[in-house]
Every structure is written in structure tokens, then in C-alpha cells.
Amino acid sequence: TFSGPCAYHDRADEMTETTLLQTIDSPADLRKLPVEKLSDVAREIRSYIIECVSHTGGHLSSSLGSVELALALHYVFNTPDDRLVWDVGHQAYAHKILTGRREGLKRVRQYKGLSGFPRRDESEYDAFGTAHSSTSISAALGMAVASHLEGHDKRWHIAVIGDGALTGGMASEALNHAGDYKEGVRLLIILNDNNCSISPPVGALCGHLGKLVSTSPFWKMRNLGKSILKNTPTLHELAKRVEKQTVNFLSPPSSIFSTYDLNYFGPIDGHDVVGLVRMLTKLRDLEGPMGPIVLHVRTVKGKGYEPAEKDPTTYH
């Protein structure tokens, strides 16, 4: 947690100009903007977070690293009906700003001010109260199963988890459980990889495959093949084995998740907000049964504030 002075602290009574940000009081307002404006909104959010945290202290580098991710998720998904769960929650300042708590961030972690973490009693957009790591996938999966049982099969449930938190036992148990659901459960796991804890992808072919399998034609052909072969058990099982081995061969980083029988995409640039919107839209609009999805996103802690980028631990 950052609690010391920063370069912005000298302007104690002058908040950064946030022309676009002042027009956004909810994700519905955000969705009215053309996607090309989201980069400008990201810059304004970063300046605003730095300004606020320079006065109050708080989780700086974590929140700066997830600005584009928060923007893209609220832009693409129908929050709060679609459920968004932030693991730990210390990276959720942009999320709070976009969900009607912009002014409240000036008193984050202060007496009678905003919590430093998502809280269900603070906003309907905070689907799950967090602060401990490795809990998000379990929470989102539980919500997804409940929604399915209640007939809300179009509702998405998104867990945003870091590479460090993914090493927790509870996260591993949730991944293992999620792999049992092949259809009817709309679960998207965002792996926010900001510290290279997971081995980097091998070769350019991996990136090419990510582009290939994230296109609608790929999944339409995949689901068409399943529908044709489902009444021929021998051929259906053979096709499943061929598909799984092909993906594992071409995309080494996905092997961790294919072990759990999850659909892996990525890695992609977590600071390219237009690219994030494009990818999330494709995943949201995929047709047919496919089970839980993992999207691997690469980000930089402290993005946009050089001292925090160089020393993300101190400015955490």
C-alpha cells in the first residue's frame, strides 16, 4: 500500500482535469462513448487515481495496472447484471470510479469514506466482498452455477485474478471444479498477469493461434462438428482428443488450463483497450456450449506513473 508523497502531492487543492470522466457516472454512460475514446478515458482515470492516492494513500500500482481492463469489462459486459469479481480487490479503483464512486475516491480508506476493496454493501456493482487472495474464481463459479439453476443462462460471471493469486490452493480447486462444467455456465476467468509468474509464451505461433481460435468462424465450425458427431460416439471421442492435442501442441501456455479442460485464449496486451474490447466482445458473443473460458492478459503494475513502474512493490 502506498502512503507516501508523490509528484502530484504539491497540487493539493487542484484535481486533474477529467473532461470525459466527469460525464461517466455509471457503466451505461461509458458505453455511450465510441470505443476510440476509451484510451482518453484511461489517461484521465490514471491521473485521477494518482491525484487521489497522493492525498489519501492506498493501492496505487495495482490499480494503475488494471485501468484498461476495468474499462473494457464494463464497456463490453452488462454490469451489474453480469457479475464482476475482483480477486483481492486492491486493483479495483478504476472499477469504483466507473461505477458511480468517482467523487468518493477522494476519501478512499478514510473515515466514512470508500472502502479500499469491493464491498457488496457499498455498490451493486461489487458482486463479492474481497480482500483475501485466490477467492474470485470460486465466488464467480458459484454465482454462475446459481444463475444457471435459476434459468439466467445469458448472464456472464467474470473473475479477475492475478498470476500470484492463481498459485493459491483455493484458486486451483476452483479451476479443477470449473472444468467439470461443459455448458450452461457462463464463466470468464481473466488472468491478470503482471509479474511473469507464469512462463511466457513460446514462439510466434502461440500468438497466431490466439488470433485464430478467438474468431467466431473457428467456434462455429467447432460446434457444427460437435453437433454432427454427437450421435456417433466413437468419432466424437476421437475428434475431442484430436482437438485437445492440437491446441496443446500449438499453444504451450494453455497446457496448464487444458489440464483442467478450460478454454484458453491469449496472452493479449492488457493496456490496448481497443484490443481488449474486441477480444472480450468476441468471447461474449461465442455461440454454442463451450464451458468456462480463461483469457490471459499481460499488464504492467504502476502503468503510467514511472516511479510505480520502476518500484511496484513500494507503490503497491
Residue ranges and their predicted role:
Residues 15-99, 256-262, 266-278, 287, ...:
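N-terminal amphipathic, basic-rich helices that act as targeting or association modules
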Residues 168-192, 205-214, 308:
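A short alpha/beta connector and helix-capping loop motif
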Residues 59-181:
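Cofactor-binding active-site loop characterized by glycine-rich and histidine/acidic residues
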Residues 87, 160-161, 188-192, 296-301:
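Short beta-strand segments
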Residues 195-316:
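Long, well-ordered, tryptophan-enriched scaffold segments
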Residues 156-158, 186-188, 290-294:
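Residue-level preference for the first positions of well-ordered beta-strands
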Residues 45-49, 53, 73-81, 101-105, ...:
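Structural signal for hydrophobic packing residues in well-ordered secondary-structure cores
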Residues 1-12:
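Short, positively charged and aromatic/hydrophobic N-terminal segments
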